[in-house]
Amino acid sequence: MTTIVSVRRKGQVVVGGDGQVSLGNTVMKGNARKVRRLYNGKVLTGFAGGTADAFTLFELFERKLEMHQGHLLKSAVELAKEWRTDRALRRLEAMLIVADKTESLIITGNGDVVQPEEDQILAIGSGGNYALSAARALVENTDLSAREIVEKSLKIAGDICVFTNLTHTIEELSE
């Protein structure tokens, strides 16, 4: 699988992910870009799960953003509804983290749209719990920037999770 983590701190939101694509117990690719910008660079997205499924969801989410003039929550809810109810989409296995300058969300195929705790940290994928734990500890105990926290959290997850590597893609937005 993978690790995607998002941290919002001091006027910045950062989403980062590793680059490993696995098929069973085999590493197929080590430098995949699982974090992207959508909607003219105003929205950051990262996926965990099937690569082909994620690209389908990226395209669909971008259409929802265009339809709702970039309103992140409305677009996420509409994507989650369609993902849950459409027969073809329901088979897609992936999770998304999406973020703009003001909010961050997780979108799942079960129709869930999850907002973060007060700490504004989100993580998904096989190494998500490791990255989430690391990010929370770093936010609480350091003055590191959001980007530095994402970098360190991905490194920790990559050191622990066999489905997460140390090749990272990181995108950020500032308020």
Swiss-Prot record:
Subcellular locations according to the entry: Cytoplasm
Top-rank lineage group of the source organism: Bacteria
Active site per UniProt: 2
CC per GO annotation: HslUV protease complex; proteasome core complex
Gene3D superfamilies for the chain: Glutamine Phosphoribosylpyrophosphate, subunit 1, domain 1
EC number: 3.4.25.2
Chain sites annotated for binding Na(+): 158, 161, 164
Keyword Protease: yes
SUPFAM superfamilies linked: N-terminal nucleophile aminohydrolases (Ntn hydrolases)
Main location: cytoplasm
Keywords noted in UniProt: Allosteric enzyme, Cytoplasm, Hydrolase, Metal-binding, Protease, Sodium, Stress response, Threonine protease
Activity regulation as described: Allosterically activated by HslU binding.
Molecular functions per Gene Ontology: metal ion binding; threonine-type endopeptidase activity
Example GO BP: proteolysis involved in protein catabolic process
A Pfam family that the UniProt record links to this protein: Proteasome
Reaction(s) catalysed (UniProt annotation): ATP-dependent cleavage of peptide bonds with broad specificity
Matches recorded under PANTHER family: ATP-DEPENDENT PROTEASE SUBUNIT HSLV, METALLOPROTEASE TLDD
Similarity section: Belongs to the peptidase T1B family. HslV subfamily.
Subunit (UniProt): A double ring-shaped homohexamer of HslV is capped on each side by a ring-shaped HslU homohexamer. The assembly of the HslU/HslV complex is dependent on binding of ATP.
NCBIfam families: ATP_dep_HslV, PRK05456.1
HAMAP family, A to Z: HslV
Stated role: Protease subunit of a proteasome-like degradation complex believed to be a general protein degrading machinery.
Protein name per the record: ATP-dependent protease subunit HslV
Organism: Histophilus somni (strain 129Pt)
Gene that specifies this protein: hslV
